[in-house]
Design a protein with these regions (language model features):
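Asp/Glu-rich intrinsically disordered low-complexity tracts
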Residues: 337-353, 357-361
Length: 375
């Protein structure tokens, strides 16, 4: 159960608690940090609970905050400056604050699989298979009889619309649909009309630099002993971002040059009208994408992915599965080659042993004749 008590062992001292989502924050990460920080206060947490963020706001998120009257969360660079930390909308250390391993994480509220997180102490972790972290937070509010005001309802609704692409993404569950409809009523907005307004704001990219476009919603994922990077943007007109593919590829390549452990970079352009994708793909592991979707990546690095719309449900698991298969095949092949080399070496040693033995015999024979000759 979500605790009403402070996790502090020193209850006389007010603590600073940071609540934040992942790097390159999207609307759900930002809204969830505000919603979760408010939940802590409503639950009676007497500490200084601060909603935070690890990066800049995108246009979609700015629109949602302004529409419902919220200020952006506090921008932070170090999580360990806080006494305690609450993570929302992520748990993967690679997607969190750079010093997350030095911070004291006390709670996690998420809707992703557990990915690389560990804690030496028992903590509260709630991650559920729904389309949005704010869907999980809505349930926590209801379970604890906390009233959801109009503006907080609007913020939760914005996150659900964003993460589920207006309830059309493969990640959408019936719980997301029911929650979104309830929140729309509380917020006093028409779900479809507001949803289209919000998503349209997120597709405006003409004044966004290539670097910011690539990293406004980008996540790193470990796959075996390698890493992949997947960025995603929404678009009503895929031609606009595709016309900028050269600049986008340059940003991606420069990033890979600096981060040698990234073996594949995918920049996904989601057509939110048809729910198809165009992906710009670079890196030595491009074959994983081709195998996953039975496609061939063009010389320009662009590939069409029919009915592929979700990074969480499709892109990451599909690509990871096939990359792991490639890694295993390479390991088997390497092992086979090593065994071949071992056999070659064994045969070489056997041959050398035979030659050495023959040489010994010849030497003994020669010495015998020399002895007889001198007698």
């Amino acid at each position: 159960m979500y605790s009403r008590e402070s996790s502090s062992s020193d209850l006389d001292k007010e603590k600073i608690i940071y609540v934040f989502g992942h790097q390159a924050p999207d609307t759900d990460a930002i809204c969830s940090s505000i919603i979760a920080a408010n939940l802590e206060k409503e639950m009676g947490n007497i500490n200084q609970v601060i909603a935070c963020r690890l990066g800049s706001l995108n246009k979609e998120t700015k629109f949602a905050l302004e529409y419902f009257g919220f200020q952006p969360p506090t921008l932070i660079t170090k999580a360990s400056e806080a006494d305690e930390v609450i993570l929302v909308d992520h748990n993967n250390p690679g997607q969190s604050a750079k010093d997350i391993k030095q911070a004291k994480v006390v709670k996690i509220i998420d809707h992703h699989g557990i990915a690389g997180f560990s804690s030496p102490e028992p903590i509260f972790i709630l991650t559920e298979p729904v389309g949005c972290c704010c869907t999980v937070l809505y349930k926590l509010y209801k379970d604890n009889d906390i009233q959801i005001t109009k503006n907080y309802a609007g913020l939760m609704l914005s996150a659900i619309i964003s993460d589920t692409v207006l309830l059309r993404s493969q990640t959408t569950t019936q719980r997301d649909v029911k929650t979104a409809n309830k929140l729309a009523k509380i917020a006093g907005v028409n779900l479809e009309e507001y949803g289209k307004q919000l998503l349209t704001k997120g597709t405006e990219i003409s004044d966004i630099a290539d670097y910011d476009l690539v990293f406004q919603d980008s996540k790193e994922f470990p796959v075996g002993d390698e890493k992949i990077q997947i960025s995603q943007i929404n678009s009503y007109d895929t031609k606009e971002p595709l016309d900028r593919k050269d600049g986008i590829k340059k940003v991606m390549q420069e990033y890979m040059d600096k981060h040698k452990d990234i073996v594949l970079f995918v920049f996904d352009i989601l057509d939110i009208y048809n729910m198809d994708s165009y992906a710009i793909v670079i890196g030595p592991r491009k074959k994983a994408v081709e195998n996953a979707y039975h496609v061939e990546i063009g010389e320009d690095g662009v590939v069409f992915l029919k009915k592929v719309a979700s990074r969480k449900k499709q892109l990451y698991p599909d690509i990871a599965h096939h990359l792991i298969n490639i890694q295993r095949k390479e390991k088997r092949s390497k092992l086979k080659e090593e065994k071949k080399e071992e056999k070659k070496e064994e045969k070489k040693e056997e041959k050398e042993d035979i030659i050495n033995e023959e040489n010994k015999k010849l030497k003994i024979k020669k010495n015998k004749y020399v002895y007889i000759y001198y007698i």
